[in-house]
Curated annotation (Swiss-Prot):
Homotetramer. It is an enzyme of class 2 (transferase). GO terms for cellular component: cytoplasm. InterPro entries: Aminotransferase_I/II_large, Met_S-MeTrfase, PyrdxlP-dep_Trfase, PyrdxlP-dep_Trfase_major, SAM-dependent_MTases_sf, Small_mtfrase_dom. The keyword Metal-binding does not apply. Its EC number is 2.1.1.12. This is Methionine S-methyltransferase. CDD domains: AdoMet_MTases. The gene is MMT1. It comes from Zea mays. GO terms for molecular function: methionine S-methyltransferase activity; pyridoxal phosphate binding. It catalyses: L-methionine + S-adenosyl-L-methionine = S-methyl-L-methionine + S-adenosyl-L-homocysteine. It comes from the Eukaryota. The keyword 4Fe-4S does not apply.
Length: 1091
């Protein structure tokens, strides 16, 4: 009796402490929890709680009275009432207080959904429950399914304290003794509760989870300011309780539906859940089932609806925020009148019905979600949370077709890793990214047993570009081309009839006549024998591609008549782990490809982008594959890096799981010796390839520092990477989102004062180099002559000579900054018919000097007088860093003020967006043609490789930032200009201290310098031996230090070399060291001006 009296006394004391208020009740409960945490006082504290429960256990009304009077209650929550036998009427004993969520229909439905999982789903797993409230679901889950650990997490600190009390209530019996399960563990071994904003506790403690379950708020608080308060256990009861009903804006697109907190929970879950993990969420159906399911699917989840029912809308939850959302959008939420209503009503109607005393319900579903390709999806979200949160609203990883998902998700993961790891544009050879060529060679070796090296593979933007480039390289008098492959060849080649007497024709005049041929091999062979072409380009019929017989017949007949053979296998190469039989590749597995033959393949067979193409050529003749790589460098610049990455990812997926070199390579028969009468490269190609300074690749032993390239390797701003990534994560991009025409019009108007509206045609190209070379072909079609100022980009001059264009040099001099002087231009134009004048500006490449508005006015006036076409190349402009006294161009005003002009006069504006938009590595060229006849001629050269839809989307976004003068983006451009200015000053200082005479420019990414102190000096090192001059110093520096510059042969200016300085910071510093080291090697410790 004394014990009972003492117990009653303790209960009375506890209740007295609770009487004053909810805060007082919480304080009393917290004091009991401290005793429960301490092993010595734990049994007594548990006995006290048992006595309190028994005091009010007589009826439900007694429990309600306790809640009103003492601001808490302890009662039983009945689980699994339908389970028979010894488990019948299993229950949990739970404490509740006013400031935390009280279990009701919402959470009971969630538990029912969890119940629909098989028992094994949680057994021995690490689980987190989000929004655990008083902990009943975490405890029930641990009690029923025996997980390894359950972490109950809640942002409400009072909820966490009460959850711990409830854990002790159910882990210990009324005598305070532990209750052990069949594995000898108690609930205290399996469950822990922590204060946590969603999964922050697990993230901070690096806990990996097998399962995440959550039943969290999905209505925006009608008082947003209330949600901005800091959550503490001393916050008001009303505020803490609101955390259970409402959520704040989370910065997700789902905020508009009240699902922002769920969205954040899902994305946080992706970072901590194991690859095989499962998330289970309670989803109110108010936004509509499609919206709820899309939240998961667009983040890469497969979903299963475990359970759906209707529940009454809680009367204490204000839905006015949903009414407001309907007012501002076309979306309608879904409610029902009472539980029996089957026709949905909108939030506004539901709100009005509730205000009038009606009762409304909404659907409630429990979804089980599992990531598809979890490791890749995790990489994508790691990238997004690293400063790219704004892109997440565009993310769409929902796919109806698994094959599309299996292709696109790995690519997005690769792209995320690439953008994250490469802060600047990596330096890749024009022949194709080395890694991509390795992957192509690896695929051929692993799947088709052909021992290729990356050098054997040359990458092109498209198959049509590869065919046209090859024909320009050889410039045959007659070529036979498969009728399926002629669609993009120049019309002039297909209409020429210069077949008779071709043996006597001048191989250097560039005339190419193409005859269309049927694909069937017997008919093609008959044509080859009769016409004896110098080049044959063909594909193969499907039935003939199965065996190698047709290919061998083509090899033999082309060898016999002295023809080069380019065989297209685009339709027969399968990017599959089980590719079908291919006769051409079977042949190559056993025999070396003869020197007169090459394989072409256009890659368009992907599951996602039908218009995304990359092509490659395979040759085992060193002279041919080297010449092809140099041809693409001159005529195209390079192939889109992103396109190579896309197909590279496909090849990687096919190779990543294989054990390398598992099978010994079979011996191949050597290639047959080909007779000498085989056509060689055209005379203009031979002389150009010999004289041009091409890209110098590095080796495994030593890397090259490139100060000889027209590319920027400065850090790529996050705004650019975000736009690139968004262009791929989006689905169903509209035409208006990729239409850059108006944006380019605005750019040229703002930058150069040119109005490109009306009849002007804007044509896009992968690079400005490719567009320039189409203009060269237009000039040749008009039988015109290209006029280049002395000091023009050496590759442009070489490209014109490669295709045998007629060229004239306009003299320039250092005193005028290598600008064209009007009088000199006029004197030159007097002696030229049909002139095309090339002007690079406002920034001149490679000198870095600027043309002012008055300069361009005078030049255009002279050109108008002589009826010249003018190609203004703005590709290297937009990065002017010394503009004091310089006046921006006003081309529209200039053109309208011309007093006289010949009818043949017109202006073509050539441009490249990557420099002006700080998007190094992502090229986008454009040309604006105001002359309709010229536009028609341009279109006749239809092999132009155009930017993919994703690039158009990227540059549309970047142009929007620039044209709208976005402050952050404008600051980035200013920073890049300042960086270039600092680099230029440092380079000038280094050059002048090392015996060079620098020509100091005002913009761009390069400058000229004269090796004054080195002229005539004898030098011998690493394979170089001779007297130094401005034309051979490139080779000497390269061999001695690994630094590559352009010599005077490239600049065209006697005595002047070119240094490009938009390098990655570390590379730039190494380059400065190389310049100093070369001075030491040649001049020793001699003091120079500026030293």
């Amino acid at each position: 009796m004394a014990a009972l009296a003492g117990e009653d006394k303790d209960v009375d004391a506890f209740l007295a402490d609770c009487t004053a208020s909810g805060d007082a009740a919480y304080g009393a409960a917290k004091a009991v929890l401290e005793r429960l945490h301490a092993p010595a006082t734990r049994p007594a504290a548990r006995r006290l709680l048992g006595a309190v429960r028994r005091r009010f256990a007589a009826s439900r009304a007694a429990g309600e009275d306790c809640f009103r009077t003492f601001h808490f209650r302890i009662h039983d929550v009945v689980l699994d009432p339908h389970v028979q036998g010894f488990q019948q009427m299993k229950k949990l004993t739970m404490m509740e207080i006013p400031s935390i969520f009280i279990p009701e229909d919402w959470s009971f439905t969630f538990y029912e959904g969890l119940n629909r999982h098989p028992d094994s789903i949680f057994r021995d797993k690490t689980v987190a429950e989000l929004g655990c409230g008083n902990g009943w679901i975490s405890i029930a889950l641990a009690e029923k399914w025996c997980p390894s650990k359950v972490y109950g997490l809640d942002i409400n600190p009072r909820a966490v304290k009460i959850a711990w009390i409830n854990l002790y209530l159910n882990a210990l019996d009324d005598d305070g003794l532990p209750i052990y399960d069949g594995e000898g563990k108690t609930l205290l071994d399996r469950v822990e509760f922590y204060e946590s904003d969603l999964l922050s506790y697990c993230r901070d403690n690096k806990i990996e989870l097998d399962r995440i379950v959550g039943c969290i708020p999905q209505i925006l608080n009608p008082n947003p300011e209330a949600m901005s308060k800091i959550v503490t256990e001393n916050s008001s009861e009303e505020f803490l309780y609101a955390l259970s009903n409402y959520c704040a804006l989370q910065g997700f697109v789902e905020d508009q539906f009240g699902l922002g907190l769920i969205a954040r929970a899902v994305e946080e879950g992706i970072s901590v859940i194991k690859p095989s993990g499962i998330m289970v969420f309670n989803m109110g159906g108010r936004p509509g089932q499609g919206v709820c399911e899309r939240l998961f699917r667009r983040r890469g989840f497969r979903i299963t609806k475990l359970w759906q029912t209707k529940i009454m809308q809680x009367a204490d939850t204000d839905i006015s925020a949903l009414v407001e959302x309907e007012k501002n959008s076309r979306h309608r939420f879904e409610f029902f009148m009472d539980l029996v209503g089957b026709q949905p009503i909108c939030a506004r109607t539901a709100w009005a019905y509730m205000k009038s005393g009606g009762h409304i319900s909404h659907a409630l579903s429990v979804y089980s979600c599992q990531l598809r390709q979890p490791n890749q999806v995790k990489k994508i979200f790691e990238f997004l949370k690293d400063g790219f949160h704004e892109v997440s609203s565009s993310l769409d990883l929902s796919f109806d077709d698994d094959s599309v998902a299996e292709e696109k998700i790995p690519f997005l993961a690769y792209l995320a890793s690439f953008l994250k790891e490469n802060k600047s544009n990596p330096c890749e050879p024009p022949a194709g990214c080395l890694n991509f060529r390795k992957l192509v060679a690896g695929f051929m070796k692993s799947y088709h047993h052909i021992p290729l090296t990356p050098d054997n593979v040359v990458v092109f933007p498209s198959r049509s570009v590869a065919i046209e480039n090859a024909l320009q390289l050889f410039s045959p008098a007659l070529a036979i081309v498969d009728e399926h492959l002629t669609r993009h060849l120049p019309k002039q080649w297909l209409t020429s009839l210069a077949i008779e007497g071709r043996a006597d024709c001048n191989h250097a005049d560039g005339t190419v006549t193409v005859i269309e041929a049927p694909r069937q091999s017997d008919l093609l062979i008959e044509l080859i024998r009769k016409l004896q072409p110098q080049v044959v380009v063909t594909g193969m019929a499907q039935f003939e591609a199965i065996t190698s017989a047709a290919f061998e017949n083509l090899l033999n007949v082309t060898k016999d008549v002295g023809s080069r053979l380019f065989l297209d296998i685009s339709e027969h190469l399968e990017l599959s782990s089980l590719p079908s039989s291919n006769g051409v590749l079977k042949y190559l597995a056993g025999k070396t490809l003869p020197s007169h033959a090459a394989i072409l393949c256009g890659l368009v067979k992907n599951q996602v982008y039908s218009d995304l193409e990359v092509a490659f050529a395979i040759s085992e003749d060193a002279a041919v594959y080297k010449a092809l790589s140099q041809t693409i460098e001159l005529l195209e610049g390079h192939t889109s890096l992103i396109s190579q990455h896309y197909y590279g990812c496909l090849f990687h997926e096919l190779l990543a799981f294989q054990i390398a070199d598992r099978h010994p390579q079979q011996e191949r028969q050597p290639a047959e010796v080909i007779p000498q009468q085989m056509i060689g490269f055209s005379d203009p190609a031979v002389s150009t390839l010999k004289a041009t300074e091409f890209f110098v690749p590095g080796s495994a032993e030593s890397s090259i520092i490139h100060m000889d390239l027209d590319r920027s390797f400065l850090p790529v701003p996050s705004a650019v990477n975000a736009s690139v990534f968004e262009s791929f994560v989006r689905q169903n991009i509209t035409d208006s989102e990729t239409d850059v025409r108006s944006s380019i019009q605005q750019l040229v108007k703002d930058s150069y004062g040119l109005s490109a509206a009306g009849c002007a045609e804007i044509i896009y190209g992968n690079t400005s180099v490719a567009l320039f070379n189409k203009l060269v072909l237009c000039c040749m079609q008009e039988q015109g002559t290209l006029l280049f100022p002395l000091g023009t980009n050496g590759h442009y001059v070489s490209a014109a000579k490669f295709v045998n264009a007629s060229t004239v040099t306009i003299p320039t001099n250092p005193s005028s900054g290598f600008r064209i002087e009007p009088k000199v231009l006029a004197d030159t134009l007097k002696n030229v018919s049909r002139p095309w004048v090339y002007v690079c500006g406002p920034t001149i490449n490679p000198t870095g000097f600027l043309y002012s508005d008055s300069d361009i006015r005078e030049l255009l006036s002279v050109c108008a007088e002589y009826g010249a076409r003018v190609v203004i190349d703005t590709s290297f402009s937009g990065l002017e860093y010394e503009t004091d006294g310089w006046r921006q161009w006003n081309l529209a005003g200039c053109l309208s003020s011309l007093k006289r002009s010949e009818p043949s006069f017109s202006v073509v504006l050539l441009g490249e967006l990557s420099f002006a938009l700080t998007a190094g590595g992502h090229d986008f060229g454009f040309v604006i043609l105001g002359d309709s006849s010229l536009a028609e001629t341009f279109h006749s050269f239809s092999s132009l490789s155009r930017p993919h839809t994703t690039l158009k989307y990227t540059f549309k976004k970047l142009l929007g930032l620039k044209n709208q003068k976005d402050q952050h983006f404008s600051d980035l451009i200013v920073e890049q200009k300042e960086e270039l200015k600092n680099r230029a000053n440092q380079l000038i200082q280094t050059l002048e201290s090392c015996g060079w005479e620098a020509a100091i420019g005002c913009g761009g990414i390069s400058m000229l310098a004269k090796p004054t102190a080195y002229m005539g000096k004898a030098f011998k090192a690493a394979g170089f031996d001779g007297e130094l001059d401005a034309s051979n110093i490139r080779e000497a520096i390269l061999r001695a230090t690994g630094l590559c510059i352009n010599s005077s042969s490239w600049t065209g200016i006697p005595g002047y070399c070119r240094f490009s300085f938009a390098l990655e910071r570390g590379e730039f510093e190494r380059a400065m060291g190389c310049i100093a080291r070369f001075k030491e090697l040649v001049l020793g410790g001699a003091q120079m001006n500026g030293a």
